[in-house]
Amino acid sequence: MIEFDNLTYLHGKPQGTGLLKANPEDFVVVEDLGFEPDGEGEHILVRILKNGCNTRFVADALAKFLKIHTREVSFAGQKDKHAVTEQWLCARVPGKEMPDLSAFQLEGCQVLQYARHKRKLRLGALKGNAFTLVLREVSNRDDVEQRLIDICVKGVPNYFGAQRFGIGGSNLQGALRWAQTNTPVRDRNKRSFWLSAARSAFFNQIVAERLKKADVNQVVDGDALQLAGRGSWFVATTEELAELQRRVNDKELMITAALPGSGEWGTQREALAFEQAAVAEETELQTLLVREKVEAARRAMLLYPQQLSWNWWDDVTVEIRFWLPAGSFATSVVRELINTTGDYAHIAE
């Protein structure tokens, strides 16, 4: 399996270096649920600004404050401990009386808003995230500037970030040990992390191989194409290639890559043969995903950061703002800009 650091670049390997996250304020994430609280219901949505504490820790503290079980507090996604993040937590608190959440105190946290809501907030139930990043000690301003311009037009590979695989790739290593020994894994969290890492690594490898082609965004017979922003896909046929290519060029359609698992991958003919060849050597992990009944899925091959803008504070410091849909990684954008100094595998999705 290709290591994350060796995955193919869309815009070529960056010429310069830089520092990501010199301090937490250099990595700001604002969660976008895509909806507002209902104003009624047995749940309470709580918007929290936090710095220096992870999502699970805050959720447990909120449960203790409300005198409810930790399983009654949910969230749409994990946010990084080493960043300034704004996100929603959801607590199930039936009854007409509204707790005074302004009294909730936790170092590094501030309650910004809270309101009643009818439904539980489930993992993944968000529209996306807005990012404000500061890159420091940038060694090649001209190269970064040109890459930002190119990304506006061509996007970046929609790779799963290094953090998906754990510190030092520990989640992927765990999946491989599991596949090789066939020993039952009782810990549900480990099972989830390991299976997710395996499937994500397959996706990254397929995309990396596709990016080696001369025309990355060229539709081929049997490609699975996705309407931009949608989850469903359809298969390209030879007769439609010219029209489908026009729609891909207009960013109306996205070429997808496989998240292998049980069931059909979604591609056919030439595209399917390419994907199967890209991961043909990884038989043990493929067998594991099928055995554990992890359903195959699709994910867009490229990612187009929305509302992308930047401002150079000086010749070596740039602030970058953009919005990404849920499940995408800011570090996959940064990877196309600079060779980062330091390890960012701990950054949450």
From Swiss-Prot:
CDD domains: PseudoU_synth_EcTruD (cd02575)
Reaction equation(s) it catalyzes: uridine(13) in tRNA = pseudouridine(13) in tRNA
PROSITE patterns the record matches: TRUD (PS50984), UPF0024 (PS01268)
GO molecular function: RNA binding; tRNA pseudouridine(13) synthase activity
Secretion signal span: none
Reported function: Responsible for synthesis of pseudouridine from uracil-13 in transfer RNAs.
Family: Belongs to the pseudouridine synthase TruD family.
The protein's name: tRNA pseudouridine synthase D
Species assigned in the record: Escherichia coli O127:H6 (strain E2348/69 / EPEC)
